[in-house]
Design a protein with these regions (language model features):
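Conserved N-terminal catalytic core of the sugar/cofactor nucleotidyltransferase
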Residues: 1-5, 31-103
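N-terminal nucleotide-binding beta1-loop-alpha1 segment
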Residues: 1-18
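Conserved core of the sugar-phosphate nucleotidyltransferase
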Residues: 113-197
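Active-site pre-lysine segment of PLP-dependent enzymes
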Residues: 119-123, 372-385, 398-461
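PLP-dependent aminotransferase class I/II
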Residues: 169-171, 280-281, 302, 451-537
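N-terminal "arm"/small-domain region of PLP-dependent enzymes with the aminotransferase-like
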Residues: 240-298, 385
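PLP-dependent aminotransferase-like
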Residues: 336-392
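Conserved PLP-binding catalytic core of the aspartate aminotransferase-like
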Residues: 518, 531-565
């Protein structure tokens, strides 16, 4: 068995990263792709490795030098017209060598787990294309396969249809060809195809023709063990690859620095970010899809219309309402406006205190392991602190502590009497029991307490974090008007605007989704409490704060779940008030996902 690596391409899409070297010289987490693959190949007992070079080929040859002489016999084939041809020509230059032995054919811009080579070599079938079920990040040649893993056809990029993706597999660009297959099938068709259509084509096109034969002799080998691989064509691919293949000591850091965008990692089960799994309904999503074209091509409305739509959304007055590009935009604006001392309950959602000087923050940390507190606790603590502003997140993040509405109104009255500006973030309130009666977003409440500002994210309970929506509501019209002028006139997009426009039709569905969520949270908590090393704190939000009581630190458990099960939870060890106390936060998802997490925890 030999290996042929195609490494002649210029890698133009990688820009400055390939200005002086070909793609396989690209370092991923400090290790060049060529070193990684040669290290993997050196474990296989191959007769030789043939590398087809072209662009900056001498740099590659000089870099490899004699470093692998004790493990691999390396030969080179040069493609002098790499800038005018495609990989079909590179392979045709190596066709004589291809026919001399059974061959692993590999493209040089891949990074993958060691297990993939063993998987394809250990399979007894002589001619295989390694494939993986289509995921949204994949680009390039696809195949369809039958129940016996015969390749029914190859689908080039120009024939790709999104409506057919459920039947697609992506070629990983690792192939195993027997010597006989290369001699009798592949090379004869390679010669004919190149002669007929030229050298600016792809070698997969030859395989596409071969699969049309009655006895093609080529099968697919789907990846079934969850092994990782990635094809690096541009700088974003490089960033994702460095996350997927990060060293275990840096893995959490790589995910945490992203602050979302986890659709790029389809196998990741995200228990870190907080979203209602039961809303929007499929019918609402269908309506959004049906209007995709017009929403994509039309400008959104400005602040006047969007504050009107948001006010309708929550049945409050337009003049009391300002819309934000997520609550985060409004938090920034609000925190920059408030002056003086601000009372903050710790641990908390850091976006608020991060916007203030530490000297301005008067922190209150509950003196109990469950981090519970009441309105009376806050009144007692802050009675002599000369606050200008009091912040309450209710339910709180990350503790899930909830203060009943009547007590929140008592706090509002207490603040009003003392001239304290009272900010209530109720982004998670619709996850609380009796949620229909817990919100402060009512005209009469806002009118009665002009010192009150209510912040609400339209991401969490509404299940649409990608739309980036939030509101700030207050009868302090000076505050609302100031905020409207502080943010951009076009601060939300057409999709977010349309979502708010149609939400009223789905209000009953939303209520049912919240009720279903509350039932699942109760069931999930019962299952989590069976894990012997977890102490689960009751919650009225869509997450549980859990203390790890034995076996692991919070960092160790978080890393184990990510490395062994592709499950991401939140390590709270760096949160103010939770340092070195071994807390993690676990989101509540749907029953299937929640049970997956529980079963993973049981194995640890």
């Amino acid at each position: 068995m030999q290996a042929i690596i195609l490494a002649a391409g210029m890698g133009r899409r990688l820009g400055e990263y390939t200005r002086d070297n070909t793609k396989c010289m690209l370092p991923v987490n400090g290790v060049r792709l060529i070193d990684r693959v040669l290290g993997q190949l050196s474990q296989l007992g191959l007769s030789r490795v043939v590398i087809v070079v072209g662009y900056k080929g001498q740099n590659l040859i000089d870099y490899i030098g004699h470093r692998y002489d004790d493990r691999l016999k390396i030969e080179y084939v040069n493609n002098p017209v790499y800038d005018k041809t495609n990989n079909i020509y590179s392979l045709s230059l190596a066709k004589d060598k291809l026919q001399e032995d059974d061959t692993l054919l590999i493209e040089s811009d891949l990074i993958f787990d060691d297990s993939l080579f063993r998987m394809i070599l250990d399979n007894p079938y002589p001619n295989l294309a390694l494939v993986d079920k289509y995921e949204t990040w994949m680009d390039g040649t696809m195949v369809r396969i039958d129940e016996d893993n015969n390749i029914v056809n190859f689908i080039p990029k120009k024939a790709f249809k999104y409506k057919d993706v459920d039947s697609y597999y992506k070629t990983v660009n690792i192939y195993k060809f027997s010597r006989e297959f290369s001699q009798n099938k592949y090379v004869p068709f390679l010669d004919a195809y190149s002669k007929a259509l030229g050298n600016n084509e792809y070698y997969e096109q030859v395989l596409r023709v071969i699969t049309l034969l009655d006895n093609a002799e080529l099968k697919a080998l789907p990846i079934t063990n969850g092994a990782k691989w990635y094809e690096i064509d541009d700088v974003q691919d490089l960033d994702i690859a460095e996350t997927l293949f990060a060293d275990k000591s840096k893995l959490m850091q790589r995910y945490n620095m992203r602050f979302g965008g986890h659709w790029r990692f389809p196998k990741l089960l995200d228990f870190c970010y907080l979203v209602n799994p039961y809303f929007p309904t499929m019918h609402m999503k269908d309506e959004l899809r049906a209007n995709f074209d017009i929403l994509l091509s039309e400008y959104p409305s400005g602040m006047y219309v969007n504050s009107l739509i948001a006010a309708k959304y929550f049945d409050i007055r337009q003049k009391y309402t300002v819309v934000g590009n997520g609550a985060a935009e409004l938090i920034k604006s609000l925190m920059e406006r408030v002056e003086g001392r601000i009372g903050v309950v710790y641990p908390t959602f850091q976006e608020y205190p991060n916007r203030k000087e530490q000297t301005e923050i008067i922190g209150f940390t509950p003196d109990n392991d469950d981090l519970t507190y009441t309105a009376d606790d806050l009144i007692r603590f802050y009675a002599d602190k000369q606050l200008s502003t009091l912040l309450l997140i209710n339910p709180d993040n990350p503790s899930g502590n909830f203060i009943p509405k009547a007590d929140v109104l008592r706090l509002a009255a207490w603040c009003k009497e003392r001239g304290i500006f009272f900010v209530v973030d109720e982004s998670f309130v619709d996850f609380s029991e009796d949620f229909r009666n817990n919100s402060l977003l009512h005209n009469e409440i806002l009118q009665a307490y002009p010192n009150l500002a209510v912040m609400k994210s339209i991401s969490k309970s509404y299940g649409v974090p990608g739309l980036r929506l939030g509101i700030l509501a207050s009868s302090d019209e000076e505050l609302i008007n100031w905020t409207k002028h502080d943010v951009s006139i076009w601060n939300i997009n057409s999709f977010a605007e349309f979502y708010m426009q149609i939400f009223g039709k789905y209000q009953k569905d939303y209520d049912r989704a919240c009720q279903k969520f509350i039932a699942e949270r109760e069931r999930f908590m019962a299952r989590l409490t069976d894990i012997p090393f977890l102490r689960v704190i009751p919650s009225q939000a869509n997450y549980f704060l859990c203390q790890i009581t034995e076996k692991y630190t919070s960092e160790e458990l978080t890393r184990r779940l990510l490395m062994d099960f592709n499950i991401l939870i939140k390590d709270c060890d760096n949160k103010d008030g939770l340092e070195n106390k071994n807390y993690v936060r676990i989101a509540v998802r749907d029953q299937k996902d929640n049970d997956t997490l529980v079963e993973a925890l049981k194995t640890l």
